[in-house]
Structures are given as structure tokens and as C-alpha cells.
């Protein structure tokens, strides 16, 4: 299985500043011109919500302050400017092969 390692596990950012979350895969999740890495946001008591698909594509309805980048094994989620409602947990997930796996999560806090 492909292991996804997220960092940091928790992050405190001031309102209006930038939050950067990293995800490293144990092997490449890129193939055929695509990077099969996705980012989710999970609020307490709710299922994960897709934010970014195929590394850098913004899901419909997601604010443009969210962006994704990366290829191969290293990926980044950026949130800028951070808003109060963004203080939840974020996960990366790959779909390069079965089974799809998730990173361990990053909890974003506002300071």
C-alpha cells in the first residue's frame, strides 16, 4: 500500500495568513500525465468534503483561497487567506492504486 505522510500534524495560523500543509507519498502517485492526489476537509461530525482533486483542481463550490500543487511524491495544500471557518482537519488521499489511502490528517487552528 502507498503510505501518505502529512505534516505538520497540527498548525496554528493567524487570520488572514497562509496555511501550508504537506503530504508525501511512499511512492509516486503520478501517471499518464495526472497526479492522483486529492485533498479533503473534515468538520466534526461530518464526512470529509473534497476540496482539491488531481493535485491542483478546485472542486466546484470550494473557495479560491484553497489551492493545491505538487507531483510525484510531494504535494502541498495552501489556504490563503485563512478564515475562521477553516479551523478544522485536512487530509490528503491518493487514488493511484488500490487500496486508496489517506494521510494522518492536519488540524488547523486559528491563533
From Swiss-Prot:
Cysteine disulfide links: 23-92
Spans annotated as Complementarity-determining-2: 54-60
Species whose genome carries this gene: Mus musculus
UniProt superkingdom: Eukaryota
Region entry Framework-2, spans: 39-53
Xref: Gene3D superfamilies: Immunoglobulins
Protein name per the record: Ig kappa chain V-III region PC 7940
Sequence segments annotated as region (Complementarity-determining-1): 24-38
Residue segments, region Complementarity-determining-3: 93-101
Lineage per the UniProt record: Eukaryota, Metazoa, Chordata, Craniata, Vertebrata
